[in-house]
A protein has these predicted regions:
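Short, glycine/acidic-rich beta->alpha junctions
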Residues: 1-4, 13-17, 137, 174-177, ...
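Short Pro/Gly-enriched beta-strand edge/turn motifs at strand-loop
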Residues: 121-128, 417, 762-766
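Membrane-proximal, glycine/serine-rich, low-complexity loop/turn segments characteristic
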Residues: 6-269, 277, 378-379, 504-520, ...
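Extracytoplasmic gating/loop element in the C-terminal half of outer-membrane beta-barrel translocons
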Residues: 62, 299-302, 307-318, 324, ...
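Extended amphipathic secondary-structure runs
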Residues: 133-153, 266, 352-388, 749-796, ...
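Extracellular/periplasmic, surface-exposed regions of secreted and cell-surface proteins
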Residues: 183-192, 198-202, 239-293, 303-333, ...
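C-terminal or late-domain output modules
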Residues: 166, 175, 390-425, 796, ...
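Conserved small-residue
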Residues: 36-117, 612-770, 814-815, 825, ...
Length: 962
């Protein structure tokens, strides 16, 4: 239920629509019991070919480190490469192409120490070989018993899910869920019916705990370069300080959830057409999260090594790369010291447990009366109320310094113990009424009124009225339409308007609360506590109002093609946002209040075709398409294009228009005393030193920081010059002030006294434009369902037509942090680069015909040369085959002999095919950010794609009914 009128009786929880789910009930066939079993076994594999850079990544990092000097001492994080070792890396890939991925780390073959004591990695490692299983398995079973006896029907169902995770080295990486449900309905007599239900669900998630922070193993899989060893053991049998070994040795964390729901209800029918319903539901959720720490002991490959002696005799290893490093045919054997790299009391030297319990009481009461005035006039009256009370309590405990990491217990830890707790509650209540009028099945009218209250607002502002109305006209039921029914089988037009209250905000926005903290000074032998000054609050916070107007049409052609179309406009008024107009001298953050508003315009289309052919083939086709655009209509006095200014399109992305990559011909050159070609340096309009550009090429010095802005080189991006002070290109790429120019308001003397923040007269953004939008646009799907002589086929596609994303991670930005080394293959293989020989004289590898700019190291984020531009935007549009199911139901004449009512076998595939425009990046187009993973925006530093890869699954199942 999407429009405000139809969703209104559900109150505040329906602010963004309602999905109605009807629980299974017992069979309506008298004195009959059906037993149904459904089970499947599933295999999960990678959803697409994930490729991280190997040799091409080494090439990129080296090229990025030698942009200016042409050679480098070394580049990398803990494990290095330079112009000397690079040829050895290249040769290794051919010489040891068949080396098993788990071959131990071997000195002289996989790495060597150079004359400066740096670990030069020659062997390359594919993280997916070490971290991801070739396949994981799951099983799902469901059993239900449904039946009836007399006026009573019942349904009992049981379910079990067992799903393995994807981490190859983990001791335990899995998820299990058990659930049970029972529902009973009985009609006592014509006056009274009663019902009851009980639901229970238990789930357990186990995973390797590699860190107590918001980072997990994938953060380091997608961080270090391909020559950083992630093989689990070295040649001496020591575990290595690698992601693989840490996951293997990590303690097993567990997350458990128990959900119980019990409901009872009754329906009283005093007279015909009058029903009175009472329902009560109690739901309780308990959760536990246990994190046992561990101590990591093994070869610390991050840091230095020592010479290896046996009985006092120095051992030597064969140096397979002497032709390149010149260190000799044999070199002193190196061995990493076996050490504990877990910091005492650090991230994994602790034990943690949290528990929470949440209760929800839901009360519903409605009465409905149907009044048939005559054959053409029908009226339905409904009155009702609903109330919800919610309360939750939580507790966490943590203690550091484990005495025995193999037996993590609070009583066996000796460090600091920390405890904390939480308690929250809220409640809502509402009263509503609805009147439906139906004239001759042609004209339909509905009116609703709600009176809602919420504990989240001050006493005087808790309660609000919310009305809604709708009307429909079944045009096809008019007498004059009869002749058209051969073509237009049915036609209905409708409209609705309504207002629903939204209270999806925190519980204490209007209450000034003081936070307690521990002081750092000691008094009377103990640390003092102190309370901070409360934040400023607005005492008049109340409901956010969501008003929706909807116009729709439903029609059917030839009794087989059904079309539904809706256009809607949804306005969120009194939106709770920070207060406007407070100066810096206010002293604290502006309090939030009902100061904002936004507006969404959208439409939805669904087309369905269904037909039964003479040969018994049943075919059903369904396609959907929807789009919506949201605009900020009121948000204080912000004038920054990066902020929430009035008139901003939600999700808009500002940046430059990419023209092409710079070439030698775009610069003015000269030669130095030795005859080497060098740039001519000049000054721009603001007296900044820049490399002189050829005639007609815009300068881009303003995009770099500092006074020396001459760093633009061949292979760097050239942006389009689209703006100047007179409105025409001016030969310089500039950023402007980044502000919105609102219409000024003048006094009688012509002085600006204020601004009209509803009228935008322009933008001071230099050569930037809106280059994309992060909001999903043109969401679509289509489904094919077919059935023929026991065979059934279901195909479901889903996609997004347009969506953009700005990259902010190793996997989404070329050169994000190339000194660490990790990057996707597509970035490394398709970037502009030059690699010189050890002397820095001759180019030994290059890629001038590239898609991405010159290899550079951004040091952890895009900036300067690779600022926001339309060439770097990720195209997140996609088409995915979400499900393909093929089944066969055996003929009853065969199964009934075994007392089987129905036997169906099927094959089902999820995420079987994905078509996207991500150029081979190892991220999933449906995962826009990683905030969802643990409900925390800082998970893995909010880096896109830094998590377990997406999988496809293939399942084989059976459905049995006795």
């Amino acid at each position: 239920l999407k429009d405000a009128a139809s969703a209104s009786i559900y109150g505040a929880k329906a602010a963004f629509g309602v999905i109605l789910i009807t629980s299974k009930k017992g069979s309506k066939e008298a004195e009959k019991v059906n037993v149904t079993y459904s089970g499947n076994v599933s295999i999960q594999t990678l959803a697409k070919d994930y490729q991280m850079a190997g040799l091409s990544g080494i090439t990129y990092s080296l090229a990025a480190a030698t942009v200016s000097a042409k050679t480098t001492g070394a580049v990398g994080a803990f494990w290095y490469v330079n112009n000397v070792s690079y040829p050895a890396v290249v040769e290794f890939q051919n010489k040891y192409a068949d080396l098993p991925y788990d071959s131990p780390l071997t000195y002289g073959r996989d790495w060597y120490m150079d004359e400066n004591g740096r670990k030069m990695g020659v062997r390359l490692y594919d993280p997916y070989d070490y971290m991801v299983k070739d396949a994981s398995f799951s099983q799902n079973h469901a059993l239900s018993v449904a039946g009836s006896k007399g006026n009573t029907n019942f349904n009992i169902s049981l379910g079990y899910l067992d799903q393995d995770g994807v981490l190859k080295p983990a001791k335990h990486d899995d998820y299990r869920r058990w659930n049970a449900n029972i529902r009973v309905n009985t009609k006592v007599n014509d006056f009274l019916a009663v019902r009851a239900g009980l639901m229970y669900s238990k789930s357990d998630r186990r995973y390797p705990l590699t860190s107590f922070s918001n980072l997990n193993a994938w953060q380091y899989v997608y961080r270090w370069g391909p020559n950083f060893p992630i093989v689990a053991y070295d040649e001496f049998g020591q575990g290595t300080r690698s992601t693989t070994y840490e996951v293997q040795e990590a303690g097993t964390a567990s997350m458990g959830t128990n959900y119980t729901s019990a409901n009872v209800g009754t329906t009283i029918t005093p007279v015909e057409n009058w029903d009175i319903n009472f329902d009560y539901t109690f739901a309780e959720t308990t959760s536990t999260h246990f994190k046992p720490g561990t101590h990591y002991v093994g070869a610390d490959v991050w840091y230095g090594t020592g010479d290896y002696y046996v009985d006092g005799v120095l051992q030597y290893a064969q140096n397979e790369w002497n032709a390149y490093n010149g260190l000799g045919a044999t070199i002193p054997m190196q061995k990493f010291a076996s050490s504990k790299w877990t910091t005492v009391g650090g991230l994994t030297d602790q034990i943690y447990q949290s528990t929470s319990i949440a209760n929800r009481h839901t009360y519903n009461a409605t009465t409905t009366y149907d009044w048939d005035i005559n054959d053409k006039n029908n009226v339905r009256f409904m009155l009702g109320m609903n109330a919800v009370a919610y309360e939750s309590r939580g507790h966490t405990s943590k203690r550091t310094i484990l005495s025995d990491p193999n037996n993590p217990q609070f009583s066996l830890a000796t460090g600091t113990q920390t405890v904390s707790g939480s308690h929250s509650w809220n409640s809502q209540a509402g009263f509503f009424g609805r009147i439906n009028y139906n004239y001759d099945e042609k004209y339909l009218l509905e009116a609703n009124i709600r009176y809602d209250g919420s504990s989240k607002f001050p006493a005087a502002l808790k309660w609000r009225w919310f009305p809604s109305f709708s009307a429909g006209w079944r045009v096809s039921e008019e007498d004059w339409f009869e002749d058209a029914k051969d073509v237009v089988s049915s036609l209905k037009v409708r409209a609705s308007w309504g207002s629903i209250g939204d209270q999806s905000v925190s519980n204490s926005l209007y209450i000034p609360t003081m936070s307690q903290s521990g002081a750092s000074w000691v008094r009377a032998g103990a640390l003092d506590n102190y309370y901070a000054t409360p934040a400023a609050v607005a005492s008049d916070i109340t409901w956010q109002d969501i008003e929706t107007i909807d116009f729709g049409v439903d029609f059917s052609l030839f009794n087989s093609v059904n079309v539904t179309f809706d256009w809607y406009k949804r306005n969120t008024n009194n939106m709770i946002v920070p207060g406007p107009g407070l100066g810096y001298n206010f002293g604290t953050s502006a309090p939030s209040g009902n100061y904002g508003s936004l507006s969404t315009n959208g439409w939805e289309l669904m087309v369905n075709y269904g037909h039964m052919f003479d040969n018994g083939l049943s075919l059903n086709l369904t396609a959907t398409l929807a789009d919506a655009v949201t605009t900020i209509t009121e948000y204080g006095t912000s004038t920054s294009v990066g902020g929430w200014y009035n008139g901003k399109t939600y999700g808009e992305i500002w940046g430059y228009r990419f023209d092409r990559l710079l070439t030698d011909e775009d610069f003015v050159w000269t030669t130095d005393a030795e005859g080497n070609k060098i740039h001519v340096v000049t000054s721009d309009s603001k007296n900044r030193q820049i490399n002189k550009m050829a005639e007609g090429i815009a300068t881009q010095g303003e995009l770099r920081s500092g006074t020396q802005r001459s760093g633009w080189l061949p292979g760097d991006p050239l942006f389009k010059d689209i703006w100047g002070k007179d409105g025409t290109p001016d030969g310089e790429i500039t950023a402007g002030t980044g502000t919105v120019n609102f219409k000024p308001i003048y006094d009688a003397e012509g002085n600006v006294v204020d601004y009209d923040y509803s009228v935008i007269e322009g933008y001071d953004v230099g050569d930037r434009e809106v280059i994309g939008n992060s909001t999903p646009r043109y969401e679509y799907s289509f489904r094919v369902d077919a059935d023929w002589k026991g065979f059934d086929l279901s195909i479901f596609f889903q996609g997004i037509g347009k969506r953009d994303m700005v990259g902010n991670a190793f996997l989404t930005v070329p050169g994000y942090n190339s000194s660490d080394g990790s990057m996707p293959e597509t970035f490394a293989a398709n970037s502009w680069y030059e690699i010189y020989d050890a002397a820095g004289k001759q180019v030994v590898a290059s890629n001038y015909d590239a898609k991405y700019p010159r290899a550079r190291n951004w040091g952890g984020g895009p900036s300067t040369y690779w600022t926001n531009n339309d060439h770097m935007l990720l195209d997140m549009s996609y088409l995915r085959l979400k499900n393909l199911t093929f089944g066969y139901t055996l003929p009853k004449k065969l199964t009934q002999k075994a007392q089987i009512e129905k036997l169906r076998l099927y094959l089902s595939c999820e995420n079987l095919l994905t078509f996207d425009n991500l150029d081979g990046l190892p991220i999933d187009p449906e995962v826009y950010s990683d905030a969802y993973t643990y409900g925390n925006d800082s998970f893995n530093s909010s880096r896109q794609g830094v998590e377990a890869p997406a999988f496809r699954s293939t399942s084989f199942g059976v459905q049995l009914t006795f």
